[in-house]
From Swiss-Prot:
Signal peptide: 1-21
Disulfide bonds: C24-C43, C38-C60, C62-C73, C74-C79
Keywords carried by this UniProt record: Disulfide bond, Secreted, Signal, Toxin
Protein name, as recorded: Toxin F-VIII
Record carries keyword Membrane: no
Source organism: Dendroaspis angusticeps (Eastern green mamba)
Other known facts: Negative results: is not cytotoxic to MDA-MB-231, HT-29 cells, and HUVEC cells at concentrations up to 300 ug/ml and is not hemolytic at concentrations up to 1mg/ml. Does not inhibit the growth of reference strains of E.coli or S.aureus (MIC values >200 ug/ml).
Gene Ontology CC terms: extracellular region
Transmembrane segments: none
Function: Is cytotoxic against A549 cells (LC(50)=106 ug/ml).
């Protein structure tokens, strides 16, 4: 019985740890291919404000506003495509 409880405890801890990370795209090309595991709960995508098809960067977190750059922040895995 103690072994079963210990096993359940370990599984719970592992599952909670996996749930605390996110997967975000992390690159500067239009093709979303490279991913990174993030501790933050948000992903971002930067693009040129007047030319949204030009991606200036993707990654973890939510950076502050910049002139001439549109920043889209989101809160789910691979949401910054």
């Amino acid at each position: 019985m103690k072994t079963l409880l210990l096993t359940l405890l370990v599984v719970t801890i592992v599952c909670l740890d996996l749930a605390s990370t996110m997967i975000c795209y992390s690159h500067k090309t239009p093709q979303p291919s490279a991913t990174i595991t993030c501790e933050e709960k948000t992903c971002y995508k930067k693009s040129v404000r007047k030319l949204p098809a030009i991606v200036a960067g993707r990654g973890c977190g939510c950076p502050s506003k910049e002139m001439l750059v549109a920043i889209h922040c989101c809160r789910s895995d691979k949401c910054n495509e």
